């Protein structure tokens, strides 16, 4: 007597479905960085812009923006002196972004409230908990 297994997928079909599902997840992640953003935010308490170096402004433009808005930079650094800071972060081809670093999640929240935007006056920035 044959042992019929109705309603069960053959192993090869299950493997194909799994491979397609994984490929779809990888494609979505490569375009949106949704998993990486979640890990950065929830686990590391960081926020990154994920732009390529070629998409960033020149180092001189970044330094000019920081100088023009020195009052806001001072306000950010005053959140927790010695434990909050601002750096120009060059990426190697003459372009740069800004990194705001901080000691606690509360510091990060205050930095985000002061900046109030996805860029610092047009310059992409990262938030790093150190």
Specify the residue positions occupied by each region the protein language model found:
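Generic surface-pattern signal
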Residues: 40, 44, 74, 78-81, ...
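Short amphipathic alpha-helices in soluble, non-transmembrane regions
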Residues: 108-118
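Short glycine/threonine-rich beta-strand-turn micro-motifs
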Residues: 45-53, 80-107
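Hydrophobic membrane-insertion alpha-helices, especially the h-region
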Residues: 11-30
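Short proline/glycine- and acidic-rich turn/helix-capping motifs at secondary-structure junctions
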Residues: 56-61, 123-130
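N-terminal presequence-like segments and adjacent domain-start helices
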Residues: 26-67
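N-terminal Lys/Arg-rich, disordered targeting/topogenic segments
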Residues: 1-7
